[in-house]
């Protein structure tokens, strides 16, 4: 339990920041899930559209410190590869 005033304030700030970060992380997961669902359905156009929406969300999460920048880059890279592979298989 925080005893000093500054420690109590720090606890309040941490709680607020935790709530914001949870919301951001949830938002990122939603966008990534939409891309994965579009890939699973086999719709290349929908997958590309979802990927283009997810990419800035991942970048924003990385810039805000919710995700490590390497983690965000890895997720973007892997999703891009899957979307590209899907578009190649549907056109060929």
UniProtKB/Swiss-Prot annotation:
Molecular function GO labels: small ribosomal subunit rRNA binding; structural constituent of ribosome
Domain of life of the organism encoding this protein: Bacteria
Gene Ontology biological-process entries: translation
Stretch list, region Disordered: 1-23
Pfam families referenced in this protein's UniProt entry, alphabetically: Ribosomal_S20p
Keyword GTP-binding appears in the UniProt entry: no
GO cellular component terms attached to this protein's record: cytosol; small ribosomal subunit
Record keywords: Ribonucleoprotein, Ribosomal protein, RNA-binding, rRNA-binding
Assigned protein family: Belongs to the bacterial ribosomal protein bS20 family.
Purpose: Binds directly to 16S ribosomal RNA.
The protein, known as: Small ribosomal subunit protein bS20
């Amino acid at each position: 339990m925080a005893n000093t005033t500054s420690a109590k304030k720090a606890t309040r700030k941490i709680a607020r920041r935790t709530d914001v970060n949870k919301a951001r992380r949830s938002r990122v997961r939603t966008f990534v899930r939409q891309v994965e669902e579009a890939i699973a359905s086999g719709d290349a156009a929908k997958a590309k559209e979802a990927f283009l929406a997810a990419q800035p969300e991942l970048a924003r999460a990385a810039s805000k410190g919710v995700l490590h920048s390497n983690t965000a880059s890895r997720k973007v890279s892997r999703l891009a590869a899957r979307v590209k592979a899907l578009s190649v298989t549907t056109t060929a």
